[in-house]
Amino acid sequence: MANRRKFSQAGGGGGGGVFDPFGTKQAVSSLRKGGRLPVYVAGVFFVIFVIIMYGEDIRSLTLDPIARAGTTPARIVEPVVTEERHVARVNPPRREVSSAEKAAALPLDVDERPKLATPTPTEAAKEVPKVEKIRKPKKPKTTKKKPRKPRPAKKTVAAAAGGLLGVPETCDLSKGEWVFDNTSYPLYREEQCEFLTSQVTCMRNGRRDDTYQKWRWQPKDCSMPRFDAKLFMERLRGKRFMFVGDSLNRNQWESMVCLVQSAMSPGKKYVTWEDQRVVFHAVEYNATVEFYWAPFLVESNSDDPKIHSIQHRIIKADAIAAHAQNWRGVDYLVFNTYIWWMNTLNMKIMRPGGQSWEEHDEVVRIEAYRKVLTTWASWVNDNIDPARTSVFFMSISPLHISPEVWGNPGGIRCAKETMPLLNWHGPIWLGTDWDMFHAAANVSRTAATRVPITFVDVTTMSERRKDGHTSVHTIRQGKVLTPEQQADPGTYADCIHWCLPGVPDIWNLILYTRIMSRPQLV
């Protein structure tokens, strides 16, 4: 009652009382009799309080079309990231915006496909489109396909069961580009191939970078399949495969042995040496992969594989029978001859009917080369059965001894080169004898009218690979170079031969593609 009296006095009538615009005094007086005063009064004052405090907000709500649509303006306006995060903590529904932020930032953190610490220029140029692909929901399919470049091999295995890989003869495999691929390359590991000689095991001999092993050749107008050792050995079952020529063909022979040996069981593969011939035996397939030493193809005073470093080289330009008797019955013959011609501009040729090497004449190199190739092609045409034997001629393997040509005037031969020449347009003047190149190409295409000869052009693609040579990570006189010798690349760097795994693997992949894309011979 005391409280009621105070309230009544505070709101009482009379001229000195408080102005009562809503007539609350009469309402209180009438309700006092019914005993419901506290509830009624509380309700009235609550309504008054709401109207006074939120009147402006209520009017703005009735006028704001966004509010009528039930959408919060903060969801449309994109503020600074820090403000976004602050609102998200106060208002939980804002977490949707936070997820969108994470999705937009994802490519900056996720795309870690390049495995090397130093990406190549080609990779760097390709990184931007890869990042953009991850931003779009549909693009993960594209990024997943990138590492699976050898997919055509899977498709061609089925086709190969019928004898074909499906790569057309019209596709020029010599034109293309080197693509960095550390997913599917190298095709084998140096330490996994027991048949490599110390001349080509660059990593074992002290080379620190292995980037040279991870470049895939991509032809311009078609694709080559990945090398399938078991598929290839099935084609070679019961057959002989032979490389004939100089040390570059021996380099390629070692590569081929390492490519195929994985298809055989331990103890079912071994190598034998027989005079000028080295033979890899694949016991389970009753097949051999061989190398025959004949640096000029015809007979010469350099035919001893153990003592052939002769300063004055002399050839019998029209004598090939002594060598060729070892080529009879071979199912695949791969020839080459070049590097041994390059120490002089003129070539010494034994005179017809001469009885000793002293009886010789000097002939311009290109003329002697054409004469030897004509002798060789005539033998092929007269002695090879095209229904049984396939014949190939490998083009020139280039040297890299002039670093100023590729923009490294301070370099020493091919030493310390770790990258191919990328995005290079036009010829590279490395000293390659293009007259000899064209002579070999023309003879291969025209001289043997009865037997097809496939000229395998590996010259231009190999000219880009200044990084692939053994350099100072090789042997000299049967021994690995000492640290002192390795520190003198001007004297000891070998810029002729190639590290394995490496460039010759691609040469063999071209051979594999051509062979497996043709019908199997008898």
From Swiss-Prot:
Annotated active site? S247, D494, H497
One annotated Gene Ontology cellular component of this protein: Golgi apparatus
Where would you find the membrane-spanning parts of this chain?
38-58
| E.C. no | 2.3.1.-
Residue intervals on the Lumenal side: 59-522
Motif GDS motif, chain ranges = 245-247
An annotated GO BP: xylan acetylation
Tell me which domain of life the UniProt entry assigns to the organism this sequence originates from: Eukaryota
Q: Residues on the Cytoplasmic side?
A: 1-37
Where does this polypeptide localize?
Golgi apparatus membrane
Motif DXXH motif, per the record, lies over: 494-497
Glycosylated residues, per the record, are N182, N286, N442
Q: What is its main location?
A: Golgi
Q: Which GO terms describe its molecular function?
A: O-acetyltransferase activity; xylan O-acetyltransferase activity
Q: What Pfam family is a match, any one? A: PC-Esterase
Which InterPro entries does the record cross-reference, listed alphabetically? TBL, TBL_C, TBL_N
Q: Which family does it belong to?
A: Belongs to the PC-esterase family. TBL subfamily.
The function of this protein is:
Xylan acetyltransferase required for 2-O- and 3-O-monoacetylation of xylosyl residues in xylan. Catalyzes the 2-O-acetylation of xylan, followed by nonenzymatic acetyl migration to the O-3 position, resulting in products that are monoacetylated at both O-2 and O-3 positions.
Protein name, per record: Xylan O-acetyltransferase 1
